[in-house]
Amino acid sequence: MFTGIVQAIGRIEGLMSQSQVLSHPASPYSDAQGLRVHLLWGDLDPSDIAEGDSIAVNGACMTVIAPTDQGCFFDISRESLNRTVGLDKPGPVHLEKALRASDRLGGHIVSGHVDGTARVTGLRSRDESHELLLEVPSSLAMFVTEKGSVSVHGVSLTVNAVSDLNGQTEISINLIPHTWKKTIFSQLAVGDRLNLEVDPLARQVARVLESLINSGRWPTAVGHAFASASAPGSDLPVQGPRA
């Protein structure tokens, strides 16, 4: 679990195919279509990172392999490659260590399970900040709300506005100077794609409602909820019948 607060900008230094992995001293990788990635920590403190720990790389949760003071390796499956961008080529990446129970939740709950990618449709200066416009896949649009939270390339951000036009959903996000300075967003261009994870809580609520509706239990479940709310001792006000 993560919180969407980037701790350092690392770098993907190299990649190995399955045939190269089999001859590598680190543990062999079983996914013939996946990759093993060599990651450099950058300014991230690796003193508390051990083999098998989780780390978010551009918002995607990866398992640390063979960590050193300079970096580590991680394996990325074909499924992850299909759902993400920025993990299959050398370049700078956002890094965040897994959240401890005692840590501050500075952003929002981020699972590190990327849902898909969003396309940059605009990037412009707004006083001292920058406005980032993203086109969200239609399959994820229902989970994105105004003033809700999203993880974009591993960064916890607040959605300022949601626009639905001609079957496309575009969201507007404000990047404050601190975020602009501490991330790789300043390197973006229109047309680039970024990893997107919607709020896990929104996804879970939608899944429960979908299950209730598909099973035909939706009216009954709602009735039980209101019955519980109107029971003695409930603090939830329930409107009585009209005359």
What residue spans do the PLM features occupy?
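Conserved loop->alpha-helix
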Residues: 1-243
